[in-house]
Amino acid sequence: MSLDLSTSLSPARPLESADAMEERLREIGAARYHDRHPFHHMLHGGELTKGQVQAWALNRYYYQCTIPVKDAVVISRFRDRATRIEWRHRLEDHDGAEGAEGGIDRWLILTDGLGLDRAYVESTDGILPATRFAVEAYVHFVRDRSPLEAIASCLTELFAPNIHATRISGMLSHYDFINPTVMAYFQRRLTQAPRDADYALRYVRDHARTPEERAAVCNALIFKTQVLWTQLDALHHAYVLGHVPPGAFVPEEMR
């Protein structure tokens, strides 16, 4: 597959306003978001085997189940009660609440539907080392960098609805083992992600007040795109090129 990964990012320039920062953020998303990755093109275009889709869902589970951990860390960074209250709904979006299904539950419906043993998925024993390292790096980032950068790292949600819509239509049309029930996670995120992105964007526009702070916001988004891209690089290396590391999940057709 030939994929043009050239970018149209503007030359480095001081970010003198919130509008200039937002323009830069959107340029970063257009150039670096993981919808451009070859593995996603294969996934959405029906080019993967069921085993390769299983490997993707299994590894992505580690990211999904760590998101509320990351969000709990973000909450812990703020003395401002209003910010904590706003961010708290993200925990329930993923963890769920008493009597209410969350995103992790919906992801497990996907892995169940793909024929993966739930206990094995939840153990995370079969994930790739790069998956674990990338996801843990994200948690460490929001713990160790400024609260502003912690929120900015979530701005990939600005670009998520498009990839979710593409994934829903592409996977439903190309794979006979995919149905609307197992795609419920992505359907829900079509409404959740824009709400979350709108808040995060407002926050960084209001609180990044110097060119240096605005540059830090942009670099936080770049870091997050690298976290996502690294996971797909690892999946492609292991399950498309066939270099599965010891201890990782091996699809039936590769055994």
Curated annotation (Swiss-Prot):
Functional pathway: Cofactor biosynthesis; pyrroloquinoline quinone biosynthesis
Source taxon at top rank: Bacteria
Keywords: Oxidoreductase, PQQ biosynthesis
Record-listed E.C. numbers: 1.3.3.11
Catalytic activity: 6-(2-amino-2-carboxyethyl)-7,8-dioxo-1,2,3,4,7,8-hexahydroquinoline-2,4-dicarboxylate + 3 O2 = pyrroloquinoline quinone + 2 H2O2 + 2 H2O + H(+)
InterPro entries linked to this entry: Haem_Oase-like_multi-hlx, PqqC, PqqC-like, Thiaminase-2/PQQC
Any one Gene Ontology BP term: sulfur compound metabolic process
GO molecular function annotations of the record: pyrroloquinoline-quinone synthase activity
Signal peptide: none
Pfam family, one: TENA_THI-4
Functional description taken from the UniProt entry: Ring cyclization and eight-electron oxidation of 3a-(2-amino-2-carboxyethyl)-4,5-dioxo-4,5,6,7,8,9-hexahydroquinoline-7,9-dicarboxylic-acid to PQQ.
Family matches, as PANTHER family: 4-AMINOBENZOATE SYNTHASE, PQQC-LIKE PROTEIN
NCBIfam families (alphabetical): PQQ_syn_pqqC
Family: Belongs to the PqqC family.
HAMAP family hit by this protein: PQQ_syn_PqqC
Name of the protein described by the UniProt record: Pyrroloquinoline-quinone synthase
Originating species: Cereibacter sphaeroides (strain ATCC 17029 / ATH 2.4.9)
The organism's taxonomic lineage, starting at the top: Bacteria, Pseudomonadati, Pseudomonadota, Alphaproteobacteria, Rhodobacterales
